[in-house]
């Protein structure tokens, strides 16, 4: 999918609150003699695209042909945006273009100074007319709302109505507790806090998540309903609730993660990618961005690199695994098998298994175990080779080799939450079923098996 997307260049229009993010890097190594405050010595300044402009930067970095429409003031920040973005900006005299100055010391943000005018723009009709003139050439529209006055109810409703009439998807990063102005959009991407405010729910735990995300879809006539859940991933409601689990990376700065998410979703929808796959990719993009400092864009090359982990490190002993699992409160999914010659059926089976929890552990029969179960001619591939093949898949989190004929001892030791087996176990005893909270049976892809592959090879000789 990444190779396909890397070759696309969809035309995407973005409207919203374009801002300037300024970073003042300082040395704060002493206390002022005048008051108990830090003395900040300025080392350098770094001016970046912020708000809707950061969504623009992300889309451009991904390879999209992006066009910006907005309203800025007749000031330095407005001029900076016009010089650095391809698009058209209406100038409202006397209006302050949003400018956020972050004071940074030792890679930590210690203070933020904002200059902005959050009153509703005076050029609504002109902006709508400009949009009507441009829209027909684009594959998707992004509304990036930071509540700075550009995306008024009138502007939002006009944009969504026009785009919908042309069958062009509209993706909205919303702000505030009233989402009614976004009614009819293709999707919204509120975070957990924003969704709670709009729904007036106390929490989104358990059944409340599905109830809430479905309510957003129905109340605001959305094609898809999405809630970003930070470290828990992205929740999607289409015909039913699905969770795209987050990708774990060290978090340095969450600034701009939401911008990267909506940029990837817009790029994917404009390129014809299925919505759940788009959510999975958006998670990977967010994981890359939060590992950086400040508002930063993401590219497909970075996402590819993110997925190229040292897969041998995913092969663990059961003792190592138990230590790692104790450190995280995650839903553990376990499955097992010989996986002698990995084929398409295995891939789809493991991919489905991963979606049922946060961490997927594959218990792998050792060479000695396979030989006892399958005969002297097996395995075809060694346990290390088989473990590396499984660990190379992004949806497999850990591989653990066991020497027994069944995984009972391993399951008893690790105590996973969910045990996965093939649908052929429907009327059979599942080893370890009494230890776990839940057993899930997954259908195999028809026509694929290691034995059939071996027979086919023998027949050709």
Swiss-Prot record:
Q: Where is this region: Cytidylyltransferase?
A: 334-461
Which processes are annotated in GO (biological process)?
A: ADP-L-glycero-beta-D-manno-heptose biosynthetic process
| Catalytic activity line of the entry | D-glycero-beta-D-manno-heptose 7-phosphate + ATP = D-glycero-beta-D-manno-heptose 1,7-bisphosphate + ADP + H(+); D-glycero-beta-D-manno-heptose 1-phosphate + ATP + H(+) = ADP-D-glycero-beta-D-manno-heptose + diphosphate
- Which EC number(s) are documented for this chain? 2.7.1.167, 2.7.7.70
Q: Where is this region: Ribokinase?
A: 1-312
CDD domains in UniProt: RfaE_like
InterPro entries registered for this protein in UniProt: Bifunc_HldE, Cyt_trans-like, PfkB_dom, RfaE_dom_I, RfaE_dom_II, Ribokinase-like, Rossmann-like_a/b/a_fold
Its Gene Ontology molecular function terms? ATP binding; heptose 7-phosphate kinase activity; heptose-1-phosphate adenylyltransferase activity; phosphotransferase activity, alcohol group as acceptor
UniProt keyword list = ATP-binding, Carbohydrate metabolism, Kinase, Multifunctional enzyme, Nucleotide-binding, Nucleotidyltransferase, Transferase
Q: Where does ATP bind?
A: 191-194
- Active site: residue positions: 259
UniProt pathway: Nucleotide-sugar biosynthesis; ADP-L-glycero-beta-D-manno-heptose biosynthesis; ADP-L-glycero-beta-D-manno-heptose from D-glycero-beta-D-manno-heptose 7-phosphate: step 1/4; Nucleotide-sugar biosynthesis; ADP-L-glycero-beta-D-manno-heptose biosynthesis; ADP-L-glycero-beta-D-manno-heptose from D-glycero-beta-D-manno-heptose 7-phosphate: step 3/4
Pfam families (UniProt xref): CTP_transf_like, PfkB
Q: Which PANTHER family match?
A: BIFUNCTIONAL PROTEIN HLDE
Q: What does the UniProt record say this protein does?
A: Catalyzes the ADP transfer from ATP to D-glycero-beta-D-manno-heptose 1-phosphate, yielding ADP-D-glycero-beta-D-manno-heptose.
Q: How does this protein assemble?
A: Homodimer.
The protein's matches in HAMAP family, at most eight in alphabetical order, are given as: HldE (MF_01603)
From the Swiss-Prot or TrEMBL record, give the protein name. Bifunctional protein HldE
Native organism is Campylobacter jejuni subsp. jejuni serotype O:6 (strain 81116 / NCTC 11828)
> Lineage, please?
Bacteria, Pseudomonadati, Campylobacterota, Epsilonproteobacteria, Campylobacterales
């Amino acid at each position: 999918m990444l190779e396909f997307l890397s070759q696309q260049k969809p035309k995407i229009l973005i409207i919203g609150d374009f801002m300037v993010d300024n970073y003042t890097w300082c040395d704060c190594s002493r206390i002022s003699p005048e008051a108990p405050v830090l003395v900040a010595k300025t080392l350098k300044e770094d001016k970046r695209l912020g708000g809707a402009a950061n969504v623009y930067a992300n889309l451009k970095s991904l390879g999209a042909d992006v066009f910006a429409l907005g309203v800025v003031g007749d000031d330095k920040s407005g001029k900076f945006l016009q010089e650095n973005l391809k698009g058209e900006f209406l100038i409202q005299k006397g209006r302050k273009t949003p400018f956020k100055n972050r004071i940074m010391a030792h890679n930590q943000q210690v203070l933020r100074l904002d200059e902005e005018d959050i009153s509703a723009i005076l050029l609504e009709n002109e902006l709508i007319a400009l949009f009507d003139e441009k829209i027909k050439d684009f594959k998707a529209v992004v509304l990036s709302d930071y509540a700075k006055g550009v995306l008024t109810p009138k502007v939002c409703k006009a944009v969504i109505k026009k785009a919908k009439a042309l069958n062009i998807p509209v993706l909205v990063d919303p702000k505030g507790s009233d989402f009614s102005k976004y009614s009819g959009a293709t999707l919204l991407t509120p975070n957990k806090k924003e969704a709670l405010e709009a729904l007036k729910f106390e929490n989104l735990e358990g059944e409340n998540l599905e109830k809430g995300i479905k309510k957003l879809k129905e109340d605001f006539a959305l094609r898809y309903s999405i809630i970003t859940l930070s470290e828990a991933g992205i929740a999607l409601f289409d015909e039913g609730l699905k969770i795209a689990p987050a990708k774990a990376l060290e978090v340095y700065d969450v600034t701009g993660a939401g911008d990267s998410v909506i940029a990837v979703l817009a790029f994917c929808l404009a390129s014809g990618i299925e919505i759940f796959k788009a959510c999975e990719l958006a998670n990977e993009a967010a994981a890359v961005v939060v590992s950086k400092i400040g508002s930063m864009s993401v590219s497909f090359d970075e996402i590819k690199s993110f997925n190229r982990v040292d897969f041998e490190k995913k092969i663990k002993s059961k003792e190592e695994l138990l230590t790692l699992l104790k450190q995280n409160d995650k839903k553990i999914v376990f499955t097992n098998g010989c996986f002698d010659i990995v084929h398409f059926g295995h891939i789809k089976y493991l991919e489905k298994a991963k979606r049922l929890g946060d961490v997927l552990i594959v218990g792998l029969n050792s060479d000695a175990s396979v030989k006892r179960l399958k005969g002297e001619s097996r395995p075809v591939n060694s346990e290390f080779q088989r473990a590396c093949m499984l660990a190379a898949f992004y949806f497999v989190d850990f591989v653990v080799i066991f020497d027994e004929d069944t995984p009972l001892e391993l399951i008893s030791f690790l105590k996973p939450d969910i045990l996965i087996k093939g649908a052929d176990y429907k009327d059979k005893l599942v080893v370890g079923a009494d230890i776990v909270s839940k057993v899930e049976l997954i259908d195999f892809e028809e026509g694929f098996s290691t034995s059939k592959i071996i027979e086919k090879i023998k027949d050709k000789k």
